[in-house]
Structure formats: C-alpha cells, structure tokens
Amino acid sequence: MVGFSGDTIAAIATAIVPQQGSVGIVRLSGAAATEIARQIFQIAGQQPWESHRILYGYIRDPESGRLVDEALLLPMLAPRSYTREDVVELHCHGGLMPVQQTLQLCIRAGARLAEPGEFTLRAFLNGRLDLSQAESIADLISAQSPQAAQAALGSLQGKLGHPIRQLRDRCLDILAEVEARIDFEDDLPPLDLEAIAAQLTAAGADMQAILSTADRGELLRTGLKIAIVGRPNVGKSSLLNAWSRCDRAIVTDLPGRTRDLVESQLIVGGIPVQVLDTAGIRETSDQVEQIGVERSRRAAQSADLVLLTIDASAGWSAEDQTIWEAVSDRPILLVINKRDRLSEAERHAIALPQQEFKAIVWTAAAQQKGIEDLEAAILAAVGTGDLTSANWDWALNQRQVAALTTAQTALRRVEETLQAQLPLDFWTIDLREAIAALGSITGEGIAESMLDLIFSRFCIGK
C-alpha cells in the first residue's frame, strides 16, 4: 500500500447502520476527486464551486440519469485538506443504499476503493501528520473514556511527537560531534566527555519520564477486565447492578439463577472497565448450570482482576476456599457483601481468611453501599489512582514503548562505551540505533512493511 501512485481513492467514511443512520459520508481523495464528483453530483441552482463551501444538489448516475440521492457536497482542495490532496465529501442520507450506491458511482467514474487507513496514510506521507499523530487518530476513534480521548487528542496535537523529535535531534547532535572527530581528528579539539555524559544522562532521564506513563497509558487505551466470582447467592448480580446503576442482571433469592456471563461497561477513575458477572461456582448436577460454572472459571482466568465475593453473614466457607484456589494465580480483591446483615461488633468479630488479597472491601450491594470504596480499591490494586484529574498528553502504544526502550538501552550502551574509553566508532553504532528507534515513533526512516502493518489496523474510510 505504501508508495501510492497518485490515484484517487474513495470510501464510506461513516459507520453503516442499516435503516438507522441519519447521514452517510462518501469521501474522495486524489487528483481526480473534483472531476469524479462533478460527474455524479448535480448542483442545484447557480451555486459557485469553491473550496470549503458546502453545495446542495443531487447525486445521479451519469450513464442513466437516475436519481440516487439528495445530498450535500463539500470540496476541500489541496493543500487545505486532511490528506493535503484534493478531497471531496458527499454527504448522503444514512443507511445502506444511498452511501453504497454513491460509492459505486465514484468507483465507476474512476476512483479506487481505499484500503484500511489509506486516507490517514496519505496525510502522513504528504507531511500533514507524523506517525505518532496518525496512530492517535485510531486511538481517538476507539477511545472508551474521556481521559483516553484526551490522551489521543494530545498526541494528535503533537505533544508526543515534539519531545520525541527533540530527543532524536539531541542524539543527532552528539553523533555529529563524534563523527566529526573521527573524520577530522587532527583539526578539532577533543570531545568534552563530561558534557556528552551529561547530555546522555539527561536524554535517558527524559526517555524514562515518557516511559513512566506507559502502564497508565495502556490502561487508558485498552481498559481493564474484571470478573465478579463467588459461590451462588452471595450478591454478585446485585453488586453488578449497584455498580452499573441499572438492572443488568436478574436478582432472586434462589441460588444458581445466573447461568451465563452478564457484561457491563463502566468507567472507573478514567479507566474503561469491562465487568463480568459470572455464574455462581459450585458443584452441580444441572448440565446448564455446569456450563455456566465452567464459563465463570474461564472468565476469571482471563480477567485482569478478580472480585471474589462472599456473604458477610455466612463468613469464609470451604466453598469460598475452593474458589480462591481456582483463581489464586490472578490478582484478587475480596468483596464481603451483605454487610448490612451484621452489626458493627459482628463485623469486627468475623473470621477473615488468611490469604493475601489486593484489598478487602465491605459492601451492601442491595443498598448500593460500598461502591466508592470498591472503586478506590480497584484503582489502588492496579497502581494508578484516579486518572480523571490528570492532564493526559499521550497514551503510549506497545510499538512506541518498544521503540523508546530500544533507544534508552542504546544510550546506556553509549554511556558504558564512554566510561570504558572505547574507540569512537563504537559510539556511532549505538547512537545510530537510538536515532533510528526514536525516528520510528514519528515515522522518520521507518520501513514500508511497518507502515503497512500500522495502517492496516485502521478502518476503511479513515
């Protein structure tokens, strides 16, 4: 896909929801975008065709004259467009037929169906975005919390790319000094080794400061999966309902009513959280319930955090011990539910298990009590605290973390080379590795195969 030949591409830029979408957009980009649009769009009246001016009219099949849709057209001529090429958007009525027929007309008129992420790839190749900005667009589209969106917008505005380019420039400056001494050793004064050591230390510290945000950034981007597990009738479904503030799960006094996983999407301290209410885990002869129990075990094994829920009035039982043993390889937070059934004195007297838990939280889910304590314990367990009050300028992805780690490791080797007083040729090897790794974050010198992989993860039309 990389290295396009200047052809004109087209794609549907909005989600296709059959019979529900109010507006659908077909996007064109390339040298022939305006010509193709003129072939299929009939302007109503005497409206002037100007860049960034919306036109009203009709989409017609140029061969048969058949009316396809009543629409708006927005031309955005180069370089003032998303791709820095001529871009035309056709705003149709939503639903399947109008946008699909309009797209087919564009292709018949000479456009090519865009590949995933090709509009953003062209924006990158034409210099409108660096690679970190391009990746942030996909993050913004998939953001599941306001904080994740804020981080994506910060990166889109260059708040990650700018410090990365500064780090790369500093490494280039050091490399230039070193190579100058290699080529013109007799004509230049010796290197100021103390100054270079200080520069390397400062650059490494700046890299570490960026890397220190990686774990929290990953949580913002991908979120947490939490499984509520426990024996039947301890209040797992009530806990989910209280937490999600709606009746997501059926609650009865009869044990074993939850047979399948019930899922709820929440935001806890700025982190997207997928909560799974599982079937009560116990030995049972009911075949359907057995399936639910097995799904519960699998859900717990795949969760980032397990909420092992017990009944305060029953205390820690042998069944609870068995469940704990089944999930003990996962981080576990103990939730003691139905605290309202015990007096204060009885709560202090209850025999708590000796196992290690991330935290122990008392709740009364039926009365919606203890939820704030539960959320605080979860944030403490994952080591983030509340992220809603922080200003997020970026959220590193795994590729960026790997590149920064490579650069940091290479700079450490340069420091070791300096301390060992090895020849300058050894310096250049590691400096070049650091420069290449930093450049890969913003897209400088990155391999075409890597670009294809990155942009293939985008949706078609973006």
UniProtKB/Swiss-Prot annotation:
(6S)-5-formyl-5,6,7,8-tetrahydrofolate binds at R27, E89, R128, K462. Its cofactor is K(+). Its EC number is 3.6.-.-. It is an enzyme of class 3 (hydrolase). Its main location: cytoplasm. InterPro entries: G_TrmE (IPR031168), GTP-bd (IPR006073), GTP-bd_TrmE_N (IPR018948), GTPase_MnmE (IPR004520), MnmE_dom2 (IPR027368), MnmE_helical (IPR025867), P-loop_NTPase (IPR027417), Small_GTP-bd (IPR005225). Residues 223-383 form the TrmE-type G domain. Pfam families: MMR_HSR1, MnmE_helical, TrmE_N. The keyword tRNA processing applies. One of its GO terms (biological process) is tRNA methylation. NCBIfam families: mnmE_trmE_thdF, small_GTP. Homodimer. Heterotetramer of two MnmE and two MnmG subunits. Belongs to the TRAFAC class TrmE-Era-EngA-EngB-Septin-like GTPase superfamily. TrmE GTPase family. This is tRNA modification GTPase MnmE. It comes from Synechococcus sp. (strain ATCC 27144 / PCC 6301 / SAUG 1402/1). The lineage of its organism: Bacteria, Bacillati, Cyanobacteriota, Cyanophyceae, Synechococcales. The gene is mnmE.
